[in-house]
Amino acid sequence: MNDSDVFKILLIGDSAVGKTSLLLRFTDPNNFQETSVNMTSVDYKNKNITIDGRTFNLQIWDTAGQERFRTITSSFYRGAHGVLVCYDVTDQLTYNNVGLWMQEIQRYGVLGVSRVLVGNKCDLEDRKLVNASIAQEYADILGIPFIETSATTGVNVEEAFMAMADEIYRNHIGGSKPSVVKPVCGSPPRTKKNIC
Ligand SMILES: Nc1nc2c(ncn2[C@@H]2O[C@H](COP(=O)(O)OP(=O)(O)OP(=O)(O)O)[C@@H](O)[C@H]2O)c(=O)[nH]1
């Protein structure tokens, strides 16, 4: 596998939005246990995926709690192809802070880094505070995919990482595959073609 076939992907967002859970659910779905998430200190995990018949290695990095102290350094962002910016759909503040995380990406990220906006914990329907249409509007303004996920049930987790991989594939490799994302838990798929 060439270096160009490795996609470095970061998970960022406020503390406790479910970044580690998403990472573990995606990379090891059969062994996913919520109880082990808090005890696990993850740096990064790998998973191979296929796009247009070509295999790519996703190297997915977790902040391992550094964001609590706002000590994410520029080295974390170095060489990143894509960033999943995560918030918790039941916690308005984590959504309000998404703009700050976008600024961090601009400040430290490489030019043209791909982004996907992820609203996690969509299984907690009764406690939902962040309206998906507001998040979708924001993502549309930025020209990036938006998707709601649940690391607990697994809903849309694979789709979120695949949307990220598709973005990187198109932006960095020059592939033409459009991201097809099902943004809200249970809504019909949506094709995104107008990414800058
Ligand atoms: N209901 C529900 N709970 C979730 C979901 N994802 C994560 N959680 C819970 O939310 C809490 C925080 O999850 P983490 O995966 O540790 O979140 P994090 O963003 O990595 O947190 P830090 O390590 O502080 O950065 C844990 O108790 C998880 O079990 C989800 O999709 N639904």
UniProtKB/Swiss-Prot annotation:
Pfam families from the entry? Ras (PF00071)
> What is the residue range of the signal peptide feature?
none
Any GO molecular function = GTPase activity
Lipid-modified residues, S-geranylgeranyl cysteine kind: 196
Q: How does it sit in the membrane?
A: Lipid-anchor
Q: Where's it mainly located? A: membrane
**Where does this protein reside within or beyond the cell?**
Cell membrane
PROSITE patterns under this entry? RAB
SMART domains, alphabetically?
RAB, RAN, RAS, RHO
Is Cell membrane there in the keyword field? yes
Q: Which residues bind GTP?
A: 13-20, 62-66, 120-123
**Can you supply a Gene Ontology BP term from the record?**
vesicle-mediated transport
GO cellular component terms listed in the entry, alphabetical order: lipid droplet; plasma membrane
Keywords (alphabetical) are: Cell membrane, GTP-binding, Lipoprotein, Membrane, Nucleotide-binding, Prenylation
Renumbered ranges of motif Effector region: 36-44
| Entry-linked NCBIfam families | small_GTP
Q: According to its UniProt record, which protein family does this protein belong to?
A: Belongs to the small GTPase superfamily. Rab family.
- What is the protein name given in its UniProt record? Ras-related protein RabG1
Organism (species): Dictyostelium discoideum
